[in-house]
Amino acid sequence: MTGKLIWLMGASGSGKDSLLTELRQREQTQLLVAHRYITRAASAGSENHIALSEQEFFTRAGQNLLALSWHANGLYYGVGVEIDLWLHAGFDVVVNGSRAHLPQARARYQSALLPVCLQVSPEILRQRLENRGRENASEINARLARAARYTPQDCLTLNNDGSLRQSVDKLLTLIHQKEKHHACL
């Protein structure tokens, strides 16, 4: 593979969806943002995803049309095999990844994988979770506790406390720095 798979991870409320939406608005000739296939309604949540029924999801998985798939929070998530075509064509591909399923991505993509962990200070994360209004106070506390204890090892860290524009700029800088380093090896 000639492209890099950027596996973007972060706690719920860390700003992954906003970051990916903004990234899609930027003109990047060799960078694509992959949509996830999810067994939830297209109108649910803020992520731009492809909604599938469980039957559709399992059909795609059974036909090896998903490069990666996992189950979390009562839903099934997948990334289509089209990302492999994009990577082979030399594109870098950004995926809204799962922290718990990073080992699965590492096993499949090995040195082509660039894991990036989006981090937000607890105060800002709490504020974002409260503002979106999807969780009650105890659910917010549980999400904050999980975010504090669950940071993958061996991944680049991107702080998302600042503006969305700053975070996208930082992400693009991280990607380009890794490309330069990889080209020099």
Swiss-Prot record:
Role this protein plays: Catalyzes the phosphorylation of ribose 1,5-bisphosphate to 5-phospho-D-ribosyl alpha-1-diphosphate (PRPP).
Enzyme class: transferase
EC number: 2.7.4.23
Keyword Repeat recorded: no
GO biological process, one term: 5-phosphoribose 1-diphosphate biosynthetic process
Gene: phnN
InterPro entries documented for this protein: GK/Ca_channel_bsu, P-loop_NTPase, PhnN
Superkingdom classification of source: Bacteria
Pathway the protein contributes to: Metabolic intermediate biosynthesis; 5-phospho-alpha-D-ribose 1-diphosphate biosynthesis; 5-phospho-alpha-D-ribose 1-diphosphate from D-ribose 5-phosphate (route II): step 3/3
GO molecular function annotations of the record: ATP binding; ribose 1,5-bisphosphate phosphokinase activity
Membership in a protein family: Belongs to the ribose 1,5-bisphosphokinase family.
Name under which the protein is recorded: Ribose 1,5-bisphosphate phosphokinase PhnN
Keyword set, alphabetical order: ATP-binding, Nucleotide-binding, Transferase
Catalytic activity: alpha-D-ribose 1,5-bisphosphate + ATP = 5-phospho-alpha-D-ribose 1-diphosphate + ADP
Transmembrane portions of the chain: none
Entries under Pfam families matching the protein: AAA_18 (PF13238)
